[in-house]
């Protein structure tokens, strides 16, 4: 990691000493600023007077054999535009990331050996590790390769969600010179400066930002941000090149993906098989019970008792920021009025939906997509269910007799459909009549960001502002609601460059309030997994 201590580390030490932040957040931010993880753990223990080291891993791990995992097997041909985590689970066995955020939420080097941030957090120097490609005679992975991948992800023609993370500090909006149907200028993005992504030498890449950003190393582990062989032009498939230990040898979408470890490459297993068992959660549980598979990507909450009864299965519970939101597209007339959107939130009983959909395994959400597990979460007034107020808002918006809508969802995992059914029943009391359209998962993936009203799952991110940037920043690829709020964008950019926990928490509180009053979602719950 960095050879010198960043100026802001002193502030982190003081915040830890003053108990403004806890030890885990100290380690997280210290490592983001370039401190090696062991050093950060040492300082956390020294300042608090308590031992604080990550749990040791077992040293004796058997080698060889085949591991089979039950998981959906989708198309994986365009890694930089992946929409779901399990897409990347196949590709990441072949291709690496520049960094890696572990289960402890600490980000460490992977294809970089270290990074250094300037005092103002606007210049990030990345030093490449000694990694090699599997093919092309085993040539070195270089700064030029990293730069190509970053530029490819930021190309608006590609449509990568990386744009949502980096738009605030590496991109600028430009006028395309064309108008939309309403006569407004059609905008696009481009890299903000010719030297924004600067190759110093084969080992050194410098990111020159237009705004300060503390989470650059975490952004580099966004799951579509895989480092692909530039010679393959962003396309991935059977036999593709990578820097990892495995090669994809077979792929049948909807059935299986088989990866084999390359001779002399590091690793413990010889082969890794992903087996697609479809939308039926019972089939997944049966496969695990009969030991046809060794593990599963995700199990349905309805089968929790079945899993608990399997002697050969260990179950661990973790509180997360995993969720799903009922999101409305603002470019559809039904949802343009913020009073209508707020009425959906006021008509939702989050606690009841939590109990029905996931048996209470999680916590009720507050309709702003920032979780209590995030270090920058701000506790604001709860938006309690209020049917009379919801009816009033609908009437003010021109719907005195209620409103008819259609909401799309998928059947797998089953809790998502159950959550939608629960909310739809609740909305009836406010005069919201919702038709539920359940699409097969593979069809839902094709339209998840296009349907006027849909229930979309969002995975955990370590910081509160990260999913806000991905999902609600104006004009970014994963802004499935077409939400646009200038004040929201301004506060979001401010939060991204603020390292002081207390100060950033206050900014997040303002963002949370905007989401509750003006936002495009009704969010019932957070999942524990």
Q: What are the roles of these predicted feature ranges?
A:
Residues 72, 249-260, 273-332, 355, ...:
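Extracellular/periplasmic solute-recognition and catalytic clefts
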Residues 154-156, 306-307, 331, 335-373, ...:
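Periplasmic-binding protein-like
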Residues 1-25, 34, 47-51:
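N-terminal secretory signal peptides
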Residues 114-165, 286-287, 334:
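Aromatic- and charge-enriched surface segment that lines or borders ligand/interaction sites
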Residues 363-396, 411-418:
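Structural transition elements
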Residues 127, 339-342, 433-444, 467-529:
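Extracytoplasmic/peripheral linker and loop segments enriched in polar/acidic and small residues
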Residues 70-119, 148, 241-242:
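N-terminal lobe/hinge region of extracytoplasmic solute-binding protein
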Residues 102-106, 178-204, 208-273, 282, ...:
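Gly/Pro-rich hinge or "lid" segments in bacterial periplasmic/extracellular proteins
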């Amino acid at each position: 990691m960095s050879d010198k201590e960043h100026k802001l580390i002193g502030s982190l030490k003081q915040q830890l000493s003053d108990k403004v932040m806890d030890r885990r957040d100290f380690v997280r931010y210290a490592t983001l600023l370039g401190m090696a993880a062991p050093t950060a753990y040492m300082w956390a223990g020294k300042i608090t007077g308590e031992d604080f080291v990550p749990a040791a891993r077992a040293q004796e791990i058997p080698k060889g054999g085949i591991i089979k995992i039950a998981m959906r097997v989708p198309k994986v041909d365009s890694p930089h535009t992946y929409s779901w985590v399990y897409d990347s689970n196949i590709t990441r066995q072949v291709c690496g990331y520049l960094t890696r955020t572990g289960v402890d939420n600490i980000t460490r080097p992977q294809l970089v050996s270290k990074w250094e941030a300037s005092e103002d957090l606007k210049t990030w120097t990345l030093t490449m590790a000694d990694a090699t490609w599997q093919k092309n005679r085993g040539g070195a992975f270089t700064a030029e390769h990293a730069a190509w991948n970053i530029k490819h992800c930021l190309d608006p023609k590609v449509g990568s969600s990386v744009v949502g993370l980096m738009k605030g500090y590496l991109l600028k909006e430009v006028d395309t010179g064309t108008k939309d149907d309403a006569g407004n200028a059609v905008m696009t993005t481009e890299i903000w400066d010719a030297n924004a992504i600067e190759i110093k030498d084969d080992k050194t890449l410098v990111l020159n930002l237009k705004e300060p950003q503390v989470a650059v190393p975490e952004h580099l582990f966004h799951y579509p941000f895989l480092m692909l062989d530039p010679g393959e032009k962003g396309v991935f498939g059977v036999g593709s090149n990578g820097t990892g230990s495995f090669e994809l040898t077979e792929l049948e979408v909807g059935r299986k993906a088989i990866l084999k470890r390359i001779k002399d490459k590091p690793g413990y297993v010889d082969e890794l098989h992903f087996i697609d068992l479809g939308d039926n959660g019972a089939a997944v549980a049966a496969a695990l019970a009969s030991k046809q598979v060794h593990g599963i990507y995700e199990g349905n909450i309805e089968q929790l008792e079945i899993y608990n009864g399997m002697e050969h299965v260990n179950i661990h519970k973790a509180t997360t920021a995993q969720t799903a939101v009922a999101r409305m597209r603002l470019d559809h007339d039904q949802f343009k009025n913020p009073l209508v959107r707020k009425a959906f939130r006021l008509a939702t009983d989050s606690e009841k939906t939590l109990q029905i959909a996931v048996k209470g395994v999680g916590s009720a959400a507050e309709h702003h997509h920032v979780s209590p597990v995030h270090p920058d979460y701000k506790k604001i007034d709860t938006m309690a269910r209020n049917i009379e107020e919801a009816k009033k808002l609908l009437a003010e918006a021109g719907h005195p007799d209620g409103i008819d809508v259609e909401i799309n969802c998928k059947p797998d995992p089953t809790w998502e459909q159950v959550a939608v059914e629960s909310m739809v029943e609740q909305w009836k009391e406010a005069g919201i009549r919702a038709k539920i359209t359940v699409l097969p998962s593979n069809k839902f993936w094709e339209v998840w960001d296009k349907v006027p009203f849909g229930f979309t799952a969002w995975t955990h991110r370590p910081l509160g502002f990260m999913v806000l940037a991905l999902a609600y920043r104006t004009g970014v690829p994963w802004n499935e609601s077409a939400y646009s709020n200038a004040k929201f964008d301004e506060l979001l950019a401010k939060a991204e460059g603020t390292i002081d926990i207390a100060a950033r928490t206050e900014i997040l509180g303002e963002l949370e309030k905007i989401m509750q009053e003006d936002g495009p979602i009704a969010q019932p719950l957070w999942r524990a997994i």
